[in-house]
From Swiss-Prot:
Any matching Pfam family: RNA_pol_Rpb6
Recorded GO MF terms: bacterial-type RNA polymerase core enzyme binding; DNA binding; DNA-directed RNA polymerase activity
Catalytic activity: RNA(n) + a ribonucleoside 5'-triphosphate = RNA(n+1) + diphosphate
Biological processes annotated in GO: DNA-templated transcription initiation
Name of this protein: DNA-directed RNA polymerase subunit omega
Signal peptide positions (record): none
Key words of the record: DNA-directed RNA polymerase, Nucleotidyltransferase, Transcription, Transferase
Length: 97
């Protein structure tokens, strides 16, 4: 297992701050099982896998963006259903009074 350096990652990312954000988001996705690693796992933790993927030149944000879009759609649906249920409960309470 080769050591991952910040310099290796910065060849593919604009700055250190962007590197931290991208690696953290990708590590979170890997940890939750939302995606398969693009490099061999080699018994590494998700944060190291994310950094190795970035150092290898993979676009780690592409899958994350697709997943975030799906999550937003799901969140909107959940909010809409919750609002409907709240209205139904409120109208039921009003009719009881």
């Amino acid at each position: 297992m080769a050591r991952v350096t910040v310099e290796d990652c910065l060849e593919h990312v604009e700055n250190r701050f962007d590197l931290v954000l991208k690696a953290a988001k990708r590590a979170h996705i890997l940890e939750l099982g939302g995606a398969e690693p693009m490099v061999p796992r080699d018994n590494d933790k998700p944060a190291v896998l994310a950094l190795r993927e970035i150092a290898a030149g993979y676009d780690v944000t592409r899958e994350g963006q697709e997943q975030e879009t799906e999550e937003v759609d799901v969140d909107r649906n959940v909010l809409a259903e919750t609002a409907k249920m709240n209205k139904a409960v409120a109208s039921q309470k009003e009719s009881e009074v």
